[in-house]
Amino acid sequence: MSSLLYIFLLLAVFISHRGVTTEAAVEPVKDINGKSLLTGVNYYILPVIRGRGGGLTMSNLKTETCPTSVIQDQFEVSQGLPVKFSPYDKSRTIPVSTDVNIKFSPTSIWELANFDETTKQWFISTCGVEGNPGQKTVDNWFKIDKFEKDYKIRFCPTVCNFCKVICRDVGVFVQDGKRRLALSDVPLKVMFKRAY
């Protein structure tokens, strides 16, 4: 009986220790060279699947209250514009599934725009505000999640405990020949290339 109790206790310690180790480990997002994405460093966001456009950039579509939308460049050879990532916790590296601001420049922070009644889409614009996690900035926070062997961008902010948010992947919606980023059931599979 005592040997059975000993085995049970040993198993319980092993399982609890393993669970703590797994939860404590934070996996960083990696670029195409296998290096961790760093806060404040420029990266291109590129599509993994080729043949449908290039990297991500901005376009003034003159159809919204925030005139600048995030789009996928129509030219496959284009890397788009570099972005910087700023995690809510100010960590040096960008962990997978952590709330981050994404910005093309200091004044072009990604934001989930208001619902477009005409297209029935939630588009991504660049009228957000950096930092200040909370109710007033909840639409400015995105996550980079693993998707198969690559990554996807997801809107599912957790910076506001009492805010009701939509949780969906970011994909592409084609409108008037422009490949606009919008919330979607079909995520855009992406990779990250450091801009030097």
From Swiss-Prot:
Main localization of the protein described in the UniProt heading: endoplasmic reticulum
Highest taxon in the source lineage: Eukaryota
Expression triggers: Induced by infestation with spider mites.
Record keyword Cell inner membrane present: no
UniProt-recorded Gene Ontology molecular function terms: cysteine-type endopeptidase inhibitor activity; peptidase inhibitor activity; serine-type endopeptidase inhibitor activity
Keyword Endoplasmic reticulum: yes
Localization terms from the record: Endoplasmic reticulum
GO CC terms of this entry: apoplast; endoplasmic reticulum; secretory vesicle
Signal peptide: 1-19
Keyword field: Disulfide bond, Endoplasmic reticulum, Plant defense, Protease inhibitor, Serine protease inhibitor, Signal, Thiol protease inhibitor
A biological process from GO: negative regulation of peptidase activity
Disulfide bridge map: C156-C167
InterPro entries per the UniProt record, alphabetical: Kunitz_inhibitor_STI-like_sf, Prot_inh_Kunz-lg
Family designation: Belongs to the protease inhibitor I3 (leguminous Kunitz-type inhibitor) family.
General function of this protein: Can inhibit both serine proteases and cysteine proteases. May be involved in the modulation of the proteases that participate in the hydrolysis of dietary proteins in the gut of spider mites.
Protein name: Kunitz trypsin inhibitor 5
Gene for this chain: KTI5
